[in-house]
Amino acid sequence: WTRLHLNWLRKLELSKVQRETVEEYLATYEALTSKIAALDVRIEDIASEERYSEKVNKLKCIKGIKTHIALSFVCEIGDFNRFKSADKFSGFIGLVPGECSSGNTERMLGITKAGNRHLRRLVVEISNTYRRGAVGRKSVALRERQKDMPKDVVAYADKATNRCQRKYQRMMFKGKNSNQAVAAVARELCCFIWGMMTGNYSRTAQAEASVYRSELD
C-alpha cells in the first residue's frame, strides 16, 4: 500500500465500529511494516560481513536479485563448487525435466520439483521479473548495485539478464504458456548463478578475449 492509499483509508467516512476495525487493521499493518524494515536492516548488516559480502554483491548485479535473495543462496548452498556443473546445480534446485522411460521409449516430463523448495521459489520469483522491461534496459536500482563492481562481473550479469529476458520472449512467441516460460527461464538463471559463484564469468571473459586476440592476429 502507498502512503496515499493509507491516508485515503484514514479519511473515509465510517461508522464508529467500522472506524475502530479499520484503525486496528492499520495499526497491525504499521507494526508489521516496521518489523519488516528492521529485519531488512539486519539482513543488510549480515550480508555486509566479510564472509558473505563478495558473493552477495556479485549476485546482486543480476536483475531481480536483491540482498535477501542473494544471501539466501549463499547461506543455503555454501560452496557452489560442490556441484560439478550448472546442470547438477539446477537439479539440486529441482529445475531439470523429469523422464519416464519404458523399454525403448523415453518421454520427457515437466521439471521434477525435487530439490530445495525455498531456493526454487526464490529463483522463480526472480524469473518473473524478466517478463517485464526491455532487453538491455537497466533500472536505476540495478545500476546502483552494479556500481564499483568488476567489469567482468557486470558483463556476465548483464549477459544473464539479457539471455533470460530473450528466452521468456522467445518461448511466449512460440505459444508456450507463461508458467512454462518462467520455469525455463528459472533453469537458465540457475546456470548463470552457478557460473557467477564458481568464477565462470572470469573464464568466459578470458576465452572471449583470447578469441578476439586471435582474430586480430
Regions found by a protein language model. Name each.
Residues 36-39, 78-82, 129-138, 190-205:
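Short helix-capping/linker segments at secondary-structure and domain boundaries
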Residues 1-3, 42-43, 102-105, 134-140, ...:
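Short coil/turn segments at secondary-structure boundaries
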